[in-house]
From Swiss-Prot:
Function: DNA-dependent RNA polymerase catalyzes the transcription of DNA into RNA using the four ribonucleoside triphosphates as substrates.
Naturally occurring in which organism (per UniProt): Parvibaculum lavamentivorans (strain DS-1 / DSM 13023 / NCIMB 13966)
The keyword Transcription is assigned to this record: yes
Quaternary structure (record): The RNAP catalytic core consists of 2 alpha, 1 beta, 1 beta' and 1 omega subunit. When a sigma factor is associated with the core the holoenzyme is formed, which can initiate transcription.
The name this protein goes by in its record: DNA-directed RNA polymerase subunit beta
Keyword field: DNA-directed RNA polymerase, Nucleotidyltransferase, Transcription, Transferase
Amino acid sequence: MTQSFTGRKRVRKVFGHIPQIAEMPNLIEVQKYSYDQFLQVDEPTGGREEQGLQAVFKSVFPISDFSESSTLEFVNYEFETPKYDVEECQQRGMTFAAPLKVTLRLIVFEVDEDTGAKSVKDIKEQDVYMGDMPLMTENGTFVINGTERVIVSQMHRSPGVFFDHDKGKTHSSGKLLFAARVIPYRGSWLDFEFDAKDIVFVRIDRRRKLPVTTLLYALGLDSEEILSTFYNSVTFTKVKQGWRVPFNADRYRGAKPERDLIDAKTGKVVVEAGRKVTPRLAKKLAEEGLKELLVQDEDIHTRYLAQEIVNMETGEIFAEAGDEITPELLEALVEAGHTDIITLDIDHVNTGAFIRNTLAVDKCTNREQALIDIYRVMRPGEPPTADTAEALFKSLFFDAERYDLSAVGRVKMNMRLDLDVSDTVRVLRKEDILAVIKTLVGLRDGKGEIDDIDNLGNRRVRSVGELMENQYRVGLLRMERAIKERMSSVDIDTVMPHDLINAKPAAAAVREFFGSSQLSQFMDQTNPLSEITHKRRLSALGPGGLTRERAGFEVRDVHPTHYGRICPIETPEGPNIGLINSLATFARVNKYGFIESPYRRVKGGKLADDIVYLSAMEESRYRIAQANVAIGKKGEIEGELVNCRIDGDFEMVPPDQVDFVDVSPKQIVSVAAALIPFLENDDANRALMGSNMQRQAVPLIRSEAPLVGTGMEEVVARDSGAAIGARRTGVVDQVDATRIVIRATEEVDSSKSGVDIYNLRKFQRSNQNTCINQRPLVRVGDQVKKGDIIADGPSTELGDLALGRNVLVAFMPWNGYNFEDSILISERIVRDDVFTSIHIEEFEVMARDTKLGPEEITRDIPNVGEEALKNLDEAGIVYIGAEVNPGDILCGKITPKGESPMTPEEKLLRAIFGEKASDVRDTSLRLPPGVQGTVVEVRVFNRHGIDKDERAMAIEREEIERLAKDRDDEFGILDRNVYGRLSEILLGKQIASGPKGMEADAKVTQANLDDLSHGQWWQIALKNEKAQSEIEALKKQYDESKERLEARFADKVDKLQRGDELPPGVMKMVKVFVAVKRKLQTGDKMAGRHGNKGVISRIVPMEDMPYLDDGQPVDIVLNPLGVPSRMNVGQILETHLGWACAGLGKKIEVALDAYHRENKPKELKDLVKQIYGDDPTVASLDEEQLVEMAGNLTNGVPIATPVFDGAREPEIVEMLELAGLDRSGQVTLHDGRTGEPFDRKVTVGYIYMLKLHHLVDDKIHARSIGPYSLVTQQPLGGKAQFGGQRFGEMEVWALEAYGAAYTLQEMLTVKSDDVAGRTKVYEAIVRGDDTFEAGIPESFNVLVKEMRSLGLNVELLTPAAN
């Protein structure tokens, strides 16, 4: 395995015992693949596949007008380049999208009025703009109106047919009522159900139920065909002694005959009455040659006729098919000479008379009546005619426009009903409906099993592409109606396709989906893990899905088929538990939308190398062993018996019967759960909290990768896009804090430039106001390979995910300060900024054009002193770098206010002094309470045609300089590459002609070239034709590249200098970004990775913290009582292992010092070999690399303990002993205040702690006087509204209990909603008086008004009125 650039700098010691064979799929593949399949941006030569956008257009077009004299056809579509790139869209608050151009063809026909024959009269083709289609960014997100959003994948019930029963809940007898439901992808649902009397009914779209035979009549069957479809027949033949009937062994199996069974041939009794016919006995009788039985009239009574019986002479009908044979009917038939009677084979044991009984209750007898009945149910109140009824029934299930099973639905139907129909047949067929009814009746007869709807074989995933496809289809169908009307109303000969199309509905559908769909969510961008988890989320909610209230326990529960597909651990706590899930690490979604999990194939008890992805349906047939089965040297499975899963159960089977083996132990869990070391030692509830809380970890100023990791850290950092990977192999040419320039050495061709420029994101704001900042890891001259990490992002360190910090923890009580999960921390942590994070707040102000005149952004603000303006520039906008506090002005703005009518005196004064300041008011943007920090960025946006102020010009100049620098660097590297290549071609070749001073026939030397300028090199012509043509090709490529770079630069500058697109009425907009530094403080929430969370209760001076024997104080003190009841023992194992890692780090530091003193590498090499064993990466390092790596290990040796395959206890003990520490993992601590050792040893070690996004600064809030609600006049609630604290019902009881009458009165009146009282109190306080009277609370008036609106008059009667 080749190690990456960062991987060599710090190698993780891996404790996993199971080798990883399969490569983990890219973690955001779900999103990217799905949307790529939808857009199919680059059209291949053979044309696009019938899927995604192509399929939508194909399904809606061609559109014909009502008279079919013209048709609008779809030819193809293409995307133009987006107007702005991702970064520009984020800054300008725009959507990152590409214009969609569709080529349409309008064909006009000439219709011959006599014959009705059509001939083509005119064909017009044209490209039509159909709105913008949002594009996905590199990282699987969408930029919509400037913010990053994620479209969450939806889990829904797969189309197809499902069989179920009501679990005995419907009827009081507890009888199981079976039902079947055919669910299409779009179209009407078809339900079949039994009622308590065993009659089969059908419902269409959950409307009123009809007997199922009505539907069968409508399908074109008559009553005899219906019976023959569902039942076999038995013929009774009249003989002297009674009736002869064929003996069928299957029919009598398990039956108890009421009368003796007599062999018709011999007349002997073969089975006595009441004796059970066992399967063995039935088989024996058949083998002994029993062919026919002799039965009496009583055996024929209560049977049903299979065919109608007609009196041949008179033509009258004796009996209908399905009629019951009564003694009278039998007698009449025998008298009329009918010797053979064909009956239905219904024995009420193996076959019930359900369909026959349904036929009997059905009032319909033919197709017309049935169609009209169905019409009446579907369209109640409309008068039916035969034609409309026929058309409606056709359109319900047999019309591809209105009914679509989808390929998935057809595949599922085929599997469930054992059909063999191509998946292009997407409507129902008569045979499908009959097969469904047969299967349902079979279930009632006790044959077969019902379906489990929570099985992942019956649930599928709809990802971005598919959701978008459905949405776009809705938009196009709305458009189709308008097009049809327009085609009929205009002169079709003169119009072009463009005139017929209004693309607004399609564009609106897209906008609505991305802007307001329940599945389009504001991306959780707290840290890289939360981004990745959000993109891999599966939600059962959303349009067409479940609702929280209706979802029962079964849907939310973990199902055996979740294994390797959906994580059983990661799901939210609260009302959404189990409805929102996460994809497992190795899982992928197949083309039908089912989740697949990978397995290694086993052939004859030996592991093969190929890896197979299986869906839940396929997997149920195989025996699958776990990843930890013992495997021999040659890949054979060891042991007599192996524990296997098969169809949700466990079996012990010999190795040669095993079909597959799991790929990896971590394929069960999701990414977040796979980041928890010793997950196997944590209780599931706590693991759930642990995986959820990692997503809330705030990126810190100094990230630090965990000492005890799981090996997943690198994968998450790479796939999330937080850390930057090299796009091509090359050499680092330039590096500074804001960008990296790499000269590519591979994959260089004429179409691409040979330079990769990576602009790093510096102190940008994320969706959650955390800080996104990238730092380069490479130096000039470093060789990097494709995919190597060249820059760290937020929460990553050396290419590893780093959500928190490793801190020294002691498990012990400390003066009650860690009661109830509180956390005690040392002042060192605050002093050294261990858990300090930067948060970036965005503030914006708009200058609008109002009725009274335009607002103005200016420094000239009325009634504001110079002190308040000290941070503003001449344009009235705050400087970058200014330290701002609550209430400070960030951007000055004045708004014109309405003129109040003036007295003549005022008018005179105004005329004399020209006083103008009074007619504007100060509406400046001020920093809200609770925020203080440094201004890090200012952006100014101007409307087209409005002059830019000085500040906007300065920002623009800076930006253009940056662009020019990028362009010049690319030019520089291009020149070096091209002229290097040119000199290689020229040197040593014969000259044909050249600039002055070069002789013909001479050879080109380096001296010749040095004398000429680069531009003159091109003038040299060579005699060698091949070399000359190479030079010409090179020159062409060089000129094209330069042109391309210049054009790109000009385009970007043009965009900058053009005005911005602002909302209507806005003249100018200013955004100010303030960076707030948040140190760790009392009240902040912290957590480990094992669900061990707590709030900081106190920050203790370093000298008072408990300290080790060598005087080192611990950083954090946790309560040991938080472990036993919570059963998350993983944190203790992590503590011990972290302690060992740090101990080894100290040993390496000592060896490194010795190396630097004496320059002897042997001791260092031996120690590293002792720690890492035979790790190939470590073995491949040279001395310089080894020393660099050792320098990175002095704070501790990082280790990986993969989930379910981690370090065992003996290995932890071995590590402790290797580090020279006590094997118990406990040490003697001393009390920091007295210096005394504590009574007994304490568990001490390193734990990876995270600071969570619940910061006390964001929550603490105080109000003096603030805004009131309009109607009730009570103070608003919540920090965002600067609200007050609600004094609720229970608080009132408390004051009542104490008899605090005056306090209570104040609370309910003057401190709340007594408007007059509030003013009086204020006046009293101003006067220095402390008496006041409370009036009537406004809420009482509201109550009175509400009662009056109900027609109840409420008045206050005074004694005087009486």
